[in-house]
Curated annotation (Swiss-Prot):
The keyword DNA damage does not apply. SUPFAM superfamilies: Ribosomal protein S10. It comes from Thermosipho melanesiensis (strain DSM 12029 / CIP 104789 / BI429). Gene3D superfamilies: Ribosomal protein S10 domain. This is Small ribosomal subunit protein uS10.
Length: 102
C-alpha cells in the first residue's frame, strides 16, 4: 500500500504497561519489514480531584486524588497487508487502550 500511513495511539494509566505494549507493537511491525516511527511520548493528561475529608466542617482539611493518563503514538510508514495481519493478531494487556487510524 504505497503512500499510506497507519497511526496507532496508545493510552494507559500505567506507563510501564504502556511502554511494554508499544515495544511489542514495534517489534511485530519491524518483523514485517515496514518502517516505524516511534513510539513518541505524548503529554500526560493529569486530572486532580480535591475532596473534603470531613462531611460536616473543617474545610481546611482536604484530600487530593490524581489521575494520570499516559499516551504514546506510533506511525507505521508503507505498511503491507502482512503488517496489518500481524497487528490484528497482537494480544495486548487489558489496561491499554488502542486507537488505530489509517
Amino acid at each position: 500500500m504505497p503512500g499510506q500511513k497507519i497511526r496507532i495511539r496508545l493510552k494507559a494509566y500505567d506507563h510501564k504497561l504502556l511502554d511494554e505494549s508499544a515495544k511489542k507493537i514495534v517489534e511485530v511491525v519491524k518483523q514485517t519489514n515496514a518502517k516505524v516511527s516511534g513510539p513518541v511520548p505524548l503529554p500526560t493528561e493529569r486530572t486532580l480531584y480535591v475532596v473534603l475529608r470531613s462531611p460536616l466542617k473543617h474545610k481546611d482539611s482536604r484530600e487530593q486524588f490524581e489521575k494520570r493518563v499516559h499516551k504514546r503514538m506510533i506511525d507505521i510508514l508503507e505498511p503491507s497487508p502482512k503488517t496489518i495481519d500481524a497487528l490484528m493478531k497482537i494480544n495486548l494487556p487489558a489496561g491499554v487502550d488502542v486507537e488505530i487510524n489509517l
